[in-house]
UniProtKB/Swiss-Prot annotation:
GO molecular function: ATP binding; nicotinate-nucleotide adenylyltransferase activity
Name recorded for this polypeptide: Probable nicotinate-nucleotide adenylyltransferase
Native species: Cereibacter sphaeroides (strain ATCC 17029 / ATH 2.4.9) (Rhodobacter sphaeroides)
Name of the gene this protein is made from: nadD
Role summary: Catalyzes the reversible adenylation of nicotinate mononucleotide (NaMN) to nicotinic acid adenine dinucleotide (NaAD).
Keywords per UniProt: ATP-binding, NAD, Nucleotide-binding, Nucleotidyltransferase, Pyridine nucleotide biosynthesis, Transferase
GO biological process entries: NAD biosynthetic process
Length: 192
C-alpha cells in the first residue's frame, strides 16, 4: 500500500487542501492519503486554533473513501516531520509513504528540521501553488536533489520509487490559503 501524507496546521482547512489531496491521489499512484493535522508548526510565530477544532473542521470538509484525517502527530508525540516519518515507518513497515507538500513549502523546505532526512527517507510529491513555482524549483532543496527529480509525465511512479525521489506537478490551482482566510477573521472569529 502507498500512502501519501499531507501534513500541516490546517488552520483552517479549506477547499484548496481537498483539491490538492484529490490531485495527489490521481497523480502520484497513491492508494490512500492521510492528513496529519499538526498540533503546531515550529516555523510559525503564533499557535494555531485548538487541535480538536481543526480536526473537526477537516473531517467535515474532507470526505473521501481513500482519505483519513488524523491527529497522529499529537497521538505519537512528535513535533517534527522527520520524527513523525520515522515513527510511522516503524509502526507500518509494509506501507510505502510519500510526503506531500505544496510548492510554497518546497521553497522553504531547507528551513525544516532535518529536511535532508525527510528527502532521504520517503519520496516527496510537490503540488504547484499560486506564485510559488519558480521559488520552489530554484530552492536549496530542489537544487540539492535535482538528480532525484522525476519528470512530471512519470509522476505515477513516485509512490513506488526509492528515496530520494521527488516530483513537481502542475495542476489547476485554487487561489486559497489558510493565512488569507485567517486574515479575514472568518476562522479566528468563530467560537471555539
Amino acid at each position: 500500500m502507498v500512502v501519501g501524507l499531507l501534513g500541516g496546521s490546517f488552520d483552517p482547512p479549506h477547499p484548496g487542501h481537498v483539491h490538492i489531496t484529490r490531485e495527489a491521489l490521481k497523480r502520484f499512484g497513491l492508494d490512500r492519503v492521510w492528513w496529519l493535522v499538526s498540533p503546531g508548526n515550529p516555523l510559525k510565530p503564533r499557535p494555531p486554533a485548538p487541535l480538536a477544532r481543526r480536526l473537526a473542521e477537516a473531517r467535515r470538509l474532507m470526505r473521501h473513501p481513500r482519505v483519513a484525517v488524523t491527529g497522529l502527530e499529537a497521538e505519537i508525540g512528535t513535533r517534527f516531520t522527520a520524527e513523525t516519518l520515522a515513527v510511522l515507518q516503524r509502526r507500518y513497515p509494509g506501507v510505502r509513504f510519500v510526503w506531500l507538500m505544496g510548492a510554497d513549502n518546497l521553497a522553504q523546505f531547507h528551513r525544516w528540521e532535518r529536511w535532508r532526512a525527510i528527502m532521504e527517507s520517503v519520496p516527496v510529491g510537490v503540488l504547484a501553488r499560486p506564485g510559488a513555482g519558480l521559488r520552489a524549483r530554484t530552492s536549496p532543496a530542489a537544487r540539492r536533489y535535482a538528480s532525484a527529480l522525476l519528470p512530471e509525465a512519470e509522476a505515477a511512479r513516485l509512490g513506488r520509487s526509492a528515496a530520494p525521489a521527488w516530483c513537481f506537478v502542475n495542476l489547476p490551482m485554487m487561489d486559497l490559503s489558510s493565512t488569507e482566510i485567517r486574515a479575514t477573521g472568518r476562522w479566528r472569529g468563530q467560537a471555539d
